[in-house]
Amino acid sequence: MNYKTFLAMCLATALCSCTNTDYKKEFTNIIDEISSPQYYGRSDYANGDINAAKYIIDYISDIEGITPMASELTTPTPAYPPYKSAVKPASEGRWNDIDNADKYLPYLQHFQIPMNVMKGDMAVSIDGKALRPTFDFTAKEFSPSCHGTYPIQSVPDSIVTNEHFINYLNSGKLAGKFAVINMAKYCTLPAHPFERYKPYLCLIDSTKVGGIILKSDELIPYFKARSYFTTPVPVIGVDKSFPEDAQNITINIDSKFLPNHDCHNIIAYLPGTDMGTDVITLIAHYDHLGLMGRDNIFYGSNDNASGTAMLCVLAKYFSTHRPKCNLQFIWLDAEEANLLGAFYYCQNPTIPLENVKLVINLDMIADDGDHLATECSENGMSELEIIKQINDNNDDYKPFNIAIQELTDNSDHYAFDQAGVPSIYFSTEGSFLKDYHSPRDSNSNYSADNFNRLFSLITSYIKMK
């Protein structure tokens, strides 16, 4: 049997299976569930993250052949990824208070990280005019609490240099004031691209500066990647509409630093038919940004309830269409906190990493259009070529425009690449990308139009292995 004939058979099988079973409907049902308000952006607020994990485990534990696989090969040890927080082993944490916890614990890998959270007030006004959170301003994730009214003073671009910047901020000229800084100019300061804020903003003397306003052409989205520390003063982002003649800021922001926030990867396993040791690992992060103030929930339908849902339905599909190779499914926590769940897993794997022939990371896959953003490790390129051939020879669906980009630390595959594991990342990019890291990434703003062809692409590839 030649390659194209075998490929056609794989595609036909995937298409038939996808047609006969409504995996697409299950895909959207899962997204809609774990992106609903009661999960609070899959954060620790009201145990939204725990409840999301319970939902995932309830789903996969009903799948025949799926087994838990959260026992590490050795005694767990901390991970120390560069330019990120340390990630330490932990106990069950909040799971100790969950009913029927024994059902869930075998699937869970526990770890802990420091995290600054914002669950209370989130209000900013300029000269008496209220700014809208996530539209007109965002709070940087490392900001401490702040309540009061302060004068505003702009910092000249000429001051924003390595020689003058911190000395000027701490000179006393800005005592009790919020300093407006041109973000584009700030980004020219010497710093590692993974750690642009900490080397400068953590040096600020809070008795000499009241706070920082970073002004950019477009509003900086909300992140959690740098929530493992706090700066001495609050930092907010605004866009170019921020008035040049602003005089005063009234700010009410509540934050709380959690030195030992408990997190939990979910790990499951499906043995293949050849009884070998080779494994394909499918990953997706199930956490999201949670809250930026009590009234601003980041629901995360596309990012990344979509990848979470795809892993669930792939597990169900392969339970009745067993491939030759073994499959591992990992729903990772703390991706938004700088990929820390993935780094912890790579430090404490549940199967030897050398047995993993490929990691496929699905992150933000509920967008429309034909663009399939792809990143691939050097040692995964041969597998990507196979996937590209499947894509290009698919007579049942229009091929994706597979756009290969530089591999960066933008999602969990990066941690596996750094551990030497062949890794591929997929993300669909279309009209809903504009809602990235905002409360608008919700159940009203995602698309399942690409589900069938991405499902077919992944299942066809795995059937060939």
How should each PLM-predicted stretch be described?
Residues 40-178, 184-189:
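Noncatalytic luminal/extracellular "stalk/propeptide" segments of secretory-pathway proteins
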Residues 23-37, 57-59, 63-67, 190-192, ...:
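Catalytic-core environment of secreted peptidases
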Residues 316, 433-465:
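His/Asp/Glu-rich mid-to-C-terminal helical/loop segments that flank catalytic regions of hydrolases
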Residues 37-47, 112, 154-155, 184-194, ...:
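Second-shell loop/turn segments in exported
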Residues 11, 15-22:
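Bacterial Sec-dependent signal peptides at the C-terminal "C-region" and cleavage site
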